Amino acid sequence: MKLLIDFFPIILFFVAFKVWGIYTATAVAIAATVAQIAYLRIRHGRIEPMQWVSLGVIVVFGGATLLSHSETFIKWKPTVLYWLMGGALLVGQLFFRKNLIRTLMGGQMELPDAAWRAMNWSWTAFFAAMGAINLWVAHAFSTDTWVNFKLFGGIGLMAVFVIGQALYLSRYMKEPQDDARTAPEDAKP
């Protein structure tokens, strides 16, 4: 369900673009993101900082698109968001000696420091690359191609990257212990 909530604005943006065009789709994306934040606030009582940033970016760049009637601003929005996320990881690591990936995921798994650093740097590089790829697609191809890339290409690249991260992390995952194998002989039924 959380995944559907996360993708709600982009799916509505895609559908609205196909039916009504970029400007209506932009307004729909803004409204859907506001609705998403309201739902999360009511349902969970708390909004993650990145969700607030995402709302701010869509309101600013979507609003600029609607006010100027220039689709350029909405096309920059994913790049700005990717670069803000990558920049936060980079600044956290370099200036504050804080690994934000570890902060976000540390309670879910135990990894050596080197693995946490590798994950932080790989996510930083991934976000930088995604921002650059978005700019390239936005300016080298039609708006229709960019919208298709935004939904299918962006999500596809993210899925491939996450699978790669999972494969990398799998070497650090401990095998679950079988209690029957490790129990003393006299304790077995």
Swiss-Prot record:
Parts of the chain that traverse the membrane: 3-23, 47-67, 76-96, 121-141, 149-169
Any single Gene Ontology cellular-component annotation: plasma membrane
Signal peptide start and end residues: none
InterPro entries: YciB
Alphabetized HAMAP family for the sequence: YciB
Protein family: Belongs to the YciB family.
Protein name: Inner membrane-spanning protein YciB
